[in-house]
Amino acid sequence: QEITNEFLDSFDEEKLMKLSDWMNNGAFQTIQEFKKLSKEEQKDIIEYLMEFTAYEEVEVKGRYYLLVHAGLGDFSEEKSLDEYDVNDFVWKRPDWDIPYFTDPNKFVVVGHTPTLGINGKPEIFYKNNFIAIDCGACFENGTLACLCLDTMEEFYV
């Protein structure tokens, strides 16, 4: 769709804020790379995004993991996951000093915030049933990390 004044007038403030966030977080590069794909690849990506979920729940060897991009905004243990907004999972960073779950076998696995900014180290960070796995691969002194939930073995590239 062409971006005209009329089109922009149809946006409410919330939509404009979301568009602004996207523009500030790589929209131009995303569009340029998307346009290079075949129509079939573009269709597959759009279908994937339409089925996107903001979180994934996984149980491994009696441990429960909530996998999210960033964290859980406005967290309450009594609040069900479907009561959260997608922004709570994608943008809101957790408070590492507050345990979110009383159950020692419940964990929140997050990315988004490089561990370099949490404790100054490019390694997987564990605290209060949080597991932060973004080790700042995009930074000169960062690394790409992977955590095997079956064994809790850490891998770094």
Show the residue positions of the predicted features.
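Acidic, His/Gly-enriched loop-helix segments that form or flank divalent-metal centers
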Residues: E14, D21-A132, G136-G142, F155
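Core catalytic region of metal-dependent phosphoesterases/phosphodiesterases
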Residues: Q1-K18
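Short, charged, surface-exposed secondary-structure boundary motifs
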Residues: T4, N141-A145
